């Protein structure tokens, strides 16, 4: 286990510590994943933990560009925010946050930690891709922003460079009549998902003008995986149950699912049809209610 615990006061202090300690340091938010990572031997060689809870990054704000969520915002605070709950377009985030249990974890875990950990079985990564989130990173060479879809590279592997840490999650303001949703299958209420999916749909005259279908835990590659062929097949089609059903079939057919001790690839493929259908149906229903 790490030996040094440092509560940083500024972002410059964080980046300096990360540069100094390199792979021996990790930034933590709520610290809810420490035991999980240690038990799997994934903190081997890490000697220093850098706590960013005093940097003032616990907020949910909305401006003309969309949502801004600080990295230290807990799941509970995000779920309670009127900004996230104000539009059906952000439903995937609310669904994913409420699906995380137990409540003690929601009270401690942070959005920045869940995304920057690079763990594919967590619920927020696919939800964040579905709502087209971007992330703001701070480092010794300045700050940069990138699409969250490009942030995940593999199991525990992200686009973070040495000396960088995640400061903020940004969700662009979506068009009117946009809805999103999240669904997952788990073996018990505190387990990682056997399979998860997040979707978003934008309607124009009750036809699909844009769609996203994003699988989370349970796919080969250990990163959120979009079913792009199924997405494209929905565009310009009427938002009917038949179209949703065909998209669910295509998404399950074209995606490569993991085959491991938790579930076979064939089982996950069957589950995918159900989860995608349910998530898309919820997204369409929410899009019809969304006024922008």
Cite the ranges covered by each PLM segment:
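C-terminal structural segment of proteins
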Residues: 1-292
């Amino acid at each position: 286990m790490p030996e040094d615990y440092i509560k940083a006061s500024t972002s410059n202090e964080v980046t300096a510590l990360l540069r100094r300690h390199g792979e021996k340091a990790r930034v933590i938010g709520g610290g809810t994943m420490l035991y999980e990572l240690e038990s799997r031997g994934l903190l081997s060689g890490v000697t220093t933990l850098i706590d960013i809870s005093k940097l003032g990054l616990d907020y949910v704000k909305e401006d003309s560009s969309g949502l801004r969520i600080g990295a230290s915002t807990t799941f509970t605070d995000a779920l309670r925010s009127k900004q996230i709950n104000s539009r059906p377009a952000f439903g995937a985030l609310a669904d994913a946050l409420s699906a995380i249990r137990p409540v003690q974890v929601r009270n401690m875990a942070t959005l920045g930690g869940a995304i920057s950990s690079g763990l594919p079985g967590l619920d927020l990564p696919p939800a964040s891709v579905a709502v087209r989130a971007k992330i703001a990173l701070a480092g010794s060479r300045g700050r940069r922003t990138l699409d969250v879809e490009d942030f995940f590279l593999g199991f525990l592997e992200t686009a973070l460079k040495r000396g960088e840490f995640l400061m903020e999650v940004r969700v662009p303001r979506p068009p009117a009549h946009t809805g999103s949703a999240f669904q997952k299958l788990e073996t018990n209420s505190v387990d990682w998902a056997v399979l998860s999916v997040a979707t978003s749909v934008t309607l124009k005259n009750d036809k699909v003008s844009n769609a996203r279908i994003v699988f989370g835990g349970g796919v080969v590659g250990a990163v959120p995986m979009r079913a792009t062929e199924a997405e494209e097949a929905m565009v310009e089609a009427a938002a009917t149950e038949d179209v949703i059903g065909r998209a669910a079939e295509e998404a399950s057919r074209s995606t490569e699912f993991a085959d491991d001790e938790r579930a076979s690839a064939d089982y996950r493929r069957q589950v995918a049809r159900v989860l995608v259908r349910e998530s898309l149906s919820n997204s369409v229903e929410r899009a019809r209610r969304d006024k922008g």
